[in-house]
Amino acid sequence: IFLAGSTFGSIFRVTTWGESHGKALGVTIDGCPAGIALSEEDIQAELDRRKPGSNPYGTKRKESDSAMILSGVFEGKTTGTPISLMVRNTDQRSRDYGNIAYSYRPGHADYTFDAKYGFRDYRGGGRSSGRETIGRVAAGAIAAKILESLGISFCTYTKSVGPVSIKKFHPEEIAENAFYMPDAQAAQEASAYLEQCMKDHDSAGGVIECRINGVPAGLGTPVFEKLDAVLAQAVMS
């Protein structure tokens, strides 16, 4: 059966590719206008925020996640043709997953992949791994450059972790803590809460909020493809 569903967007089209324990992961972006200043450093800055091993509360896997632009950029500017980026995997330990080759993990996509395709890559979740988000983050970094040229800016942060919610909003504090919270006190409380969760072998949920400024009125349509529906499709996919 054909594996579809790896592309999102219509004007700005994003196609992610790769698996958690493959040689590399990446993304191809079609629809980026020509003349946008873009470098690997622009993308790397965002990838460094999501890379594993940089947060004590995330995965223990260590990856440099170094971005390599393969096409679509010349002399520091986009050419208007498809932009392809790649990040090599360097810390795969596939042997750690040998015991689940014939069993399914609760809460993962093991069973659904097997049921749909009759075959699955059990090493680290394969295509359903969180490392698939490398392509999304890289594409987001490029989209941010385009939006910046249009006067649109955004701020994303963690609003709550478990029962701990922010009470203040200081944007300058977002990058100063492991939770990207705009409230230093709330970040300390979230840290203590998660430390207890770890001791209890428990997990916790959270809420992320995004503020976008400079968006012109009238985006979206009144019936199908409403703006909130399109955003929901992106966020929930």
Indicate where each model-derived feature is located:
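Short, conserved charged micro-motifs
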Residues: G35-E40, S94-D96, G220
